[in-house]
Swiss-Prot record:
Coiled coil: none annotated. Pfam families: PCRF (PF03462), RF-1 (PF00472). SUPFAM superfamilies: Release factor. Keywords: Cytoplasm, Methylation, Protein biosynthesis. The modification N5-methylglutamine is found at residue 230. One of its GO terms (cellular component) is cytoplasm. The keyword Transit peptide does not apply. Methylated by PrmC. Methylation increases the termination efficiency of RF1. It comes from the Bacteria. This is Peptide chain release factor 1. It is found in: Cytoplasm. Signal peptide: none annotated. The lineage of its organism: Bacteria, Pseudomonadati, Spirochaetota, Spirochaetia, Leptospirales.
């Protein structure tokens, strides 16, 4: 481990040096992101190497020390140092796991109503509100890209972006089917209905990551029915883009400007094309699938929200909270932390196997 930690130190210092010399904005951005990623492990590695040297120095002194009090003090110092090294080694094991290739990326979130009719659409709106509140607590900016509303305050679908380097790491375990059990407001008999909503987390893809030919696109413009007042209903500001080779269709209508809506739709298109390629690759990566918390499959039922019992259960890790009202208000830290810890444990076990 010592050699590996020294290499990390060297890499970090090299990045610091390159940052001091860099002038191009893209280079500065990439170097800053890499430094930010390495800083925690560099700090921990520095502490580990320092304590290792202190222990070695104390052992050398112990061999030639005849004074009983000094001998006892050095022995105690070595024991404390070795205990601390054990703790640091466990932390470093986790920190040195291969990073998720999408870590540090902004994301697009798609929430779609599934089975359950109007009740599913209402829960789609509830999930968006929950994520919006959680994002706000974490300082993430939510930007709506497209939405299709139902007549009673729900959504058939809503797509939004979270533009922050913490976004993917916080939301990556939300992909899948979310099931809700509750008595609908429209239900006169008081019967519990079960509905479902699907969530897709799409890491944002940069233009250089996904090549899209203009000739492969069919672009349609139409009058928006979204936010923005009367203006959006009197001009063809909404944009729908079809990627002919894959059949992927994306849309954006939340901006007054057709150009801005086109840019937003292209962001979604790039993310979906990249996601489709990743899903194809994932089918042949069985070992990687087993190392993750759940498969991230859209059809996988990951969580149940039981309103009559005030209970939320994540089926992938057996996590249950009996404080559903707080969760629906965006208090997701305990749940997401549990998912992150379980994922780390599985990846660590896989690395040692």
């Amino acid at each position: 481990m010592i050699d590996r930690l020294k290499k990390i130190q060297e890499k970090y210092l090299r990045i610091e040096d390159e940052l001091a010399k860099a002038t191009a904005s893209d280079t500065l951005k990439n170097l800053s992101k890499e430094r930010s990623r390495l800083t925690p492990v560099y700090t921990k590695a520095d502490e580990y190497l320092k304590i290792t040297k202190d222990c070695q120095d104390a052992k050398s002194l112990l061999e030639s020390e005849n004074d009983p009090d000094m001998h006892s003090m050095l022995k105690s110092e070595i024991e404390e140092g070795e205990k601390k090294l054990e703790e640091l080694a466990k932390e470093l094991e986790i920190m040195l796991l291969p990073p998720d290739p999408n870590s540090g990326k902004s994301i697009l979130v798609e929430i779609r109503a599934g089975t359950g009719g109007e009740e599913s659409g209402l829960f789609c709106a509830d999930l968006f509100r929950m994520y919006n509140k959680y994002a706000d607590k974490k300082g993430l900016r939510v930007e709506i890209i497209d939405m299709s509303q139902t007549g009673i305050g729900g959504y058939k679908e809503i797509v939004f972006s979270l533009d922050d380097d913490k976004a993917y790491d916080l939301f990556k375990f939300e992909s899948g089917t979310h099931r809700v059990q509750r008595i609908p407001e429209t239900e006169s008999g008081g019967r519990i209905h079960t509905s479902a909503v699907t969530v897709a987390i799409l890491p944002e893809a940069e233009e250089k990551e996904v090549e899209i030919k203009e000739s492969d696109l069919r672009i349609d413009v139409y009058r928006s029915s979204g936010a923005g007042g009367q203006h959006v209903n009197t001009t063809d500001s909404a944009v729908r883009i079809t990627h002919i080779p894959t059949g992927i269709v994306v849309a954006s209508q939340e901006e007054r400007s057709q150009i801005k809506n086109r840019d937003k739709a292209m962001r979604v298109l790039r993310a979906r094309i990249a996601d489709q390629a990743a899903e194809t690759a994932k089918l042949s990566a069985d070992a990687l699938k087993k190392a993750q918390v759940g498969s991230g499959d859209r059809s996988e039922r990951i969580r149940t929200y039981n309103f009559p019992q005030g209970r939320c259960t994540d089926h992938r890790i057996g996590f249950t909270s009996h404080n559903l009202p707080a969760i629906m208000e965006g208090d997701l830290d305990e749940l997401i932390d549990a998912l992150i810890q379980e994922d780390r444990s599985k990846r660590l076990a896989e690395a040692k196997a």
